[in-house]
Amino acid sequence: MAPSSLLLSVGSLITSSLVSATALEARQSQTYQLAESWQGESFINDWNFFDGADPTNGYVTYVNQSFAKQSGLVKVTESGSFYMGVDYESTLNPNGAGRESVRIESKNYYTEGLYVIDIEHMPGSICGTWPAFWSVGKNWPNDGEIDIIEGVNLQKANKIVLHTSGSCDVSGSNDMTGTLSSSECGEASGTVGCVVKGTNGSSGDPFNESGGGVYAMEWTDTFIKIWFFPRSQIPASLASGNPDTSSFGTPMAHLQGSCDFAERFKAQKLIIDTTFCGDWAGNVFAESTCPMSDPSSPMQSCVNYVAQNPAAFKEAYWEINSIKIYQYGVSAASSAAVSQATASKVEGTRVSAQAANTATPTVPAPVETTTVPQPAQTNTVATSAADHATPSSAETTTVPAATGAPSVSATEGGDSELESTSTVYVTSTTTICPVAESSSAAAAGGKEDAPSNGTSGAEVAATSVAAAAPAAATSGHPGADAIANSAAATSTDAQSESATSRLTAGALSEIPTAPPEPVSQAVSTGSFDDSDTAQGDSEEQGSIASASVAPSTIPVPASSSAAALGGSSIASSFASSRLIPRPTGSSTAASATAIATWSPTAGESASGTAKESATLTTPSEVFFTPGLSNGANRMSVGLSGLIGVMFIAALA
């Protein structure tokens, strides 16, 4: 009895053979369907124009699309074909910029299939030229390169070359009309690659004299075959648009062997170009019987010839009727592309904002102030404080926007994502000032009453209010730099705000590169009365009749947040250094960081004499100081805890 391991090996071999045969039969039973096609104007509009330095070190200046069209280097002929030529009028300096030419690249990368190019004319057999129709993967040489049509100088036969990484050997015993001169496609052969020399007349002058023809490449995971058909010998199935490679006959190149084509040749973009001299044409210039102006340097002789003989390159042009890509089971409505090749199509970085309960700041509830209902589930960041935030009674918190940050809608406990081209982190600044009725639409919010939650000032002092600013993106879309998630800051007997006494948030200013210079004025002045003084142990609040903020912007740390809470409340973090006027007439310098909630109440008139109240907590130093206005009016002081209250009482 045979060992079980032997039986398993035999069974695996039989199974593998059956699977391979089945796959081959399935492939043979399929037909190629058109997946991509270009002709005429689509070459100009749907391909990228490469205008960088020549990777092959040629004496060439590749031009962009606009210049190529204006100068006539690319155009659509009367017959509808695509013309792509070179400058054949300018005499050049051999030590200057190279001859103008065009290199176009497909925008997408493509995988296995049947590639068909119908060429009416290709660059002729001209000294110094190096035309090519080829493909290359994103990561050279690992993803491979396929040179379908390539030749230099006076050559009249095409050279088909494959390049890839490692070792990739193909057999010379495959049936083909061309001649295999190198069987190693990988780096083991240096930069030579595996090379098949085509039949005479497959490129250059003889190709053009016979009216051009069609090249077809079949690329699978096991082989690459390339056919050349002169104009008079194009297969009927190919001409009808229903290609059947089994009727194509013997290919010019049949590259197959121990090389793993599925691993060595990945998705490729197509390239058509004409360069001059360079690493190949320049180095073999002397071997091509081209004129040697410098016997010691074939390369310099090539450059001299190209620079000083413009008329020689009148025939160095491509005229292409079409390029088509066929694939199994892929309709023309589907894309054969596997990825985008241009930066303009790259997916952007996703930016998300998350509402976190642990970062929710708590503010004391004033006894007689108008407050804004807190959102039950959603925080919506407005895209523009002036244009997009409208008054609403919905339970929504509106944050004024900063230019350059994305619009983010965040659901509590979840994410909302936005695409952009890149991600940055920003620190915003904000300026708050009273505005007239016509500007009150800049902050959204409602006039609904809300019950008090009994939050005390002591709780405020102990609450962490660090709220990280979300990532922003340079997408050019307006958005917000922070989201303030305030706990239910409510009051008893909340009043409806007067239309003439709304205090709204101004648009966020541009991001400062450095903190602003101190301004020699108090942050806020106004008139007050004793009835607005807070009733809590450590709550510091007052009624502000005409609040104003210094003209300079105040930087908000990245760990803070600034928001307009509804239409009548504003919560912000401030940091500044000010000269504070004292009741005695002297001034005191004070550096302060404060978290304040401004809640305007009903006004007395439209002249700005309305009473408004504010809640303020300060970690350390004086932020608002007493200012005298209209005799008996006073303003409360922002200090920490009981010391602040005692200090206010002493000043009073």
Curated annotation (Swiss-Prot):
SUPFAM superfamilies: Concanavalin A-like lectins/glucanases. Residues 390-410 have a biased composition (Polar residues). It comes from the Eukaryota. GO terms for biological process: cellulose catabolic process; glucan catabolic process. The active site is at E145 (nucleophile), E150 (proton donor). Residues 379-423, 509-551 are annotated as: Disordered. Residues 36-289 form the GH16 domain. This is Probable endo-1,3(4)-beta-glucanase AFUA_2G14360. The lineage of its organism: Eukaryota, Fungi, Dikarya, Ascomycota, Pezizomycotina.
